[in-house]
């Protein structure tokens, strides 16, 4: 009887762990795009195209866009470092009939647990528009998965009451896992 109860307890705890972990992964997937990656030797392209946001009458508008990437990875001790490559950022805006834009690019950046990798902005006649991109990651030991969270925050400010404008930004990058060679 004790052996039977012990087996039931083990099964119940295992099931609880799976459901708990699933809810963690599901919380990352909500309101975001999700990419599942099986081959760790692939370079993972990441594109975030954001919708334009508008501001007028002296107001400021802020909008956040997110994309999550989950990478299954069985042995984190083999990981040498995490790198973003081919980073490109673009921000443009339209104000009073004219278009303005700014592009930035970086070859690569090493990812720490919370990395700010692009801070792209453009201003004209007191109107400030910016796009700020960050990436953070977490490791889920139960599912043996890295969860990368890319966040892009757009801010558009129309300082003049007669101004109406929109700002739009996007960025592309590639996620690369560099492994120890054995």
Please describe what each predicted stretch is:
Residues 1-29:
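Classical Sec-dependent N-terminal signal peptides that target proteins to the secretory pathway
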Residues 3-4, 25-182:
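Low-complexity, repetitive regions of proteins mediating host interaction that are extracellular
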